[in-house]
Every structure is written in C-alpha cells, then in structure tokens.
Amino acid sequence: MVLVDDDAMAVLNRTYRGGVGPTDVLAFPMLEGRFHDVSPDLLGDVVISTETAQRHALAIGGGLRGELALLLVHGILHLVGYDHGTATERRDMWRRQRLILMACGIQPPVRVCMARGRPPRPERLHRRGPDGDA
C-alpha cells in the first residue's frame, strides 16, 4: 500500500488511466504485464490518496480510518480480479467489500451502505467511534 497526496495521485491517474485529477484509489496488479514472473507471491500495489480519502470521510460524516480501510479492501479486490464496470459486478464487489470490512471488525462507511441501494441503519451510525470505526 502506498499513501500519496492528490498531486501524486493525479499524475498516476493521468499516466496509467488517462484520467483527469486525483482519484481515491488505484490498483496495479503484479500478475499482469511484463513483471508477472518476478514474484508470483505479490499481488501488486494499492495506491491511496489520503487527501481524497479525507474529503470522502468528511462528506459522509465518517472517519478517515474507516475510509482508508474501505479503499485498501477495494484496491485489493481489484488486484485479485474484481471490477465494477457493470451493475452486477458493482453489486458483487460492494458486497464483498462490506463483508471483508465487517469480518475485520470495521463498520463499513456509509457510502458502502448507500451503494447497496439502502440507507444505513441509524443504530449503526451511532455506534461508530470518533474515527469512524465501530
């Protein structure tokens, strides 16, 4: 995992995805491309913009730790082949993110619940700690 600021993320996003500006998380799988045989035990790199993560956390009223955990899980799922290009893929990936976070004892950020098409249960919002964790 690599933590970067928005400027560095914008460069990576433009260079590797043709995107404009920063994004929250990028995944670079090692099992693809010219370095796939260097170390088959390494999945790849997950790059997270801490500035974008902080903005997301503030926008939903959550904590930075929960947001960073979500982005790390999201990136790892990309490394092992998950995507969210279609509605079905998105539902499956979001469900897996939620299950993984909960298995780690982390209450998924509100936006994961909202992505599932339902608001979070109010009692879960009140249980969250000061940094967004359950």
Where are the model-predicted features located?
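Catalytic glutamate of the conserved HExxH
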Residues: 71, 75-79
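Active-site rim/adjacent substrate-binding subdomains
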Residues: 1-67, 79-134
